[in-house]
Amino acid sequence: MFDTVCTLPLSADLFSQALHPKEPVVSVGLSSGHVQTFRLPTDEAASDDDETSNASSRNGRGHIDTMWRTRRHKGSCRCLTFGIDGETLYSAGTDGLIKAAKAETGVVENKIAIPTEKNGSIDAPTIIHALSPQTLLLATDSSALHLYDLRIPYSKVSAKPEQSHHPHDDYVSSLTPLPASDTSTSGFSKQWVTTGGTTLAVTDLRRGVLVRSEDQEEELISSTYIGGLAASGTSRGEKVLVGGSGGVLTLWEKGAWDDQDERIYVERGGGGGESLETMAVLPDELGKGKVVAVGLGNGRVKFVRIGANKVAAEVMHDETEGVIGLGFDVEGRMVTGGGQVVKVWHEAVVGADRYGAMPGEKRMYGDSDDSDEGDDSDDDSDDSDAGGRQDKPQNKRKKTKAKGKGGQQIMAFHDLDSMESSVVY
């Protein structure tokens, strides 16, 4: 399914990664406060006479271009998210600010001050998510979950959240929106699942926190939604997958939030398994069934087939740094990030790839951080290093060195391709 890997070096540790919802674009937030946006090559199948072909195609076939780069925050850039339409990139940093910038140019259009803690200190962000064109969600270290109404014409740094909740006793470690109901008129999600500490919670846009699970006696770190599973009995074929600190993936039936109903051991190890830091469901277009990619604290990415409930394949992102970011772009390529590296995993081709590399060869791109051109995209002097404070990469668990030498550098999905098609998902 995937074959070669492209490596994008970064100038500092990765804290956050966001994929554009409509274009082959990835943005990264770094420990240095920088935000950088790359444009990936488009599919070769695109028409040669397409006048809207992106800059990558015009500048040279297969080039990965830096669209813009700037020091967006005085301190670390903790989290990033694109708006629903992809026009706006939201970032939040340890300087206590949310910034909304044009995704294409990086020019800041608005700023919002994050509410401080009771003692007046900065409440650093942990997650930012655009729930709809009207609603922006922000979670912080203090366990607060703020809701901003984007329809209100904010003045700079004066905006206050419309609502604030505390769904957990600890900071919110993951946030997963639930699909809109069949009766929804907007088509946008109005409920979401969060994890924090050892609990899972469901919050509603209008009614606040609806339910909180029992104590799972394990730190819950990551989550994602998967639908289209086989419905039977009380199961409607919709589940939320939750990754824990001990290497266990738990399955939660949508609507039955008191406790988990299934467990999958993704990574076993002496003294406890490896933490499951991030995950993403493989796009249906890839034709691999119901499979979720799981990024681990030891730098591996494992592919778990839901239904069979087993690990089907794995690859190595990095031998020493954990996986912080994981997702699939609009062309079905997997993008992983962690440490000072982002990797783009391409779908397998026969013979040489579109960059002239043969399957299994690792392609390096060294121009991503050679220059700070475009650092003036933020017109508020954000590229000043004075007073900047860096904190540690936001791995939910302590990063550990992967065992073994020489990580696999190609997408070896033989197991995924060869598993019997009779498996019921």
UniProtKB/Swiss-Prot annotation:
It comes from the Eukaryota. Keywords: Nucleus, Repeat, WD repeat. GO terms for cellular component: nucleolus. WD repeats lie at residues 9-48, 72-111, 117-158, 221-262, 318-355. It is found in: Nucleus, Nucleolus. Residues 367-385 have a biased composition (Acidic residues). Residues 395-404 have a biased composition (Basic residues). Residues 40-63, 358-425 are annotated as: Disordered. Belongs to the WD repeat WDR55 family. This is WD repeat-containing protein jip5. It comes from Aspergillus niger (strain ATCC MYA-4892 / CBS 513.88 / FGSC A1513). The gene is jip5.
